[in-house]
């Protein structure tokens, strides 16, 4: 702990199980989603492959950055933390089904609620100084 504190890190003690579950949500699930989205984009009809690359918007580019991670490392993480990742994937699948249903039903109110709840999470991340665009994660005190 002293080592990390001297480097400017904040430390928190948690059990191995809690660590693995939290990381399955905050790191492993986003990687699964990124790999799936990029695979979906490139496995579209071949006639659109060049267009997908040429017109890739910020969202797809963000996912390709994540999906370009070391395959061997992520294979090992997915295997080692499979129990938690599968549990989180099941929850994600339910949310995705709800999202799909709202789109299919053209339920604008439900979509707005979904968007607003996730937008609030972003605000909380910024408030907690977890903005990763900065080299010090926004923690440096001026």
What feature does the model see in each segment?
Residues 34, 38, 68, 97, ...:
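Charged/polar positions within long, soluble alpha-helices
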Residues 49-118:
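Interdomain hinge/lid region at the active-site interface
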Residues 28-31, 117, 121-124:
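Alpha-helical scaffold segments in carbohydrate-active enzymes
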Residues 120-142:
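Long, positively charged, glycine-interspersed low-complexity recognition regions
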Residues 1-64:
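Internal alpha-helical scaffold of NAD(P)-dependent oxidoreductase catalytic cores
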